């Protein structure tokens, strides 16, 4: 009987992981959208053009990386879980 429960629990975990991973491609769509709308300056070989293109690309990469940073969201979620469990620890006496 416990093996049936274990199999059911494993199937449930796999289903949740599959659903969670299916929700992730929005970042890839945003990435493609940003890269398709990039208006880099035509490269004429000058240092100024190369610098502008570099800085613009660096800004885009920074935005994409900031979207992937979930540590901040997890920290906030943990804080609010603590507040829901023990309001005194968050808001004082």
UniProtKB/Swiss-Prot annotation:
Q: What does this protein do?
A: Inhibits juvenile hormone biosynthesis.
Query: Which named protein is this?
Result: Allatostatin C
State where the protein is found: Secreted
Q: Which UniProt keywords apply?
A: Cleavage on pair of basic residues, Disulfide bond, Secreted, Signal
The source's domain of life comes to Eukaryota
Any single Gene Ontology cellular-component annotation: extracellular region
Give yes or no: UniProt keyword Protein biosynthesis: no
Q: Which residues cross the membrane?
A: none
């Amino acid at each position: 009987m416990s093996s049936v429960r274990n199999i059911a629990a494993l199937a449930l975990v796999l289903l949740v992981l599959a659903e969670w991973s299916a929700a992730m491609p929005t970042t890839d769509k945003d990435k493609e959208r940003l890269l398709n709308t990039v208006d880099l300056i035509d490269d004429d070989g000058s240092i100024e053009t190369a610098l502008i293109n570099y800085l613009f690309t660096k800004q885009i990469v920074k935005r994409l990386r900031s979207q992937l940073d979930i540590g901040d969201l997890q920290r906030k979620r943990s804080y609010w879980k603590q507040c829901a469990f023990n309001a005194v620890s968050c808001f004082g006496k």
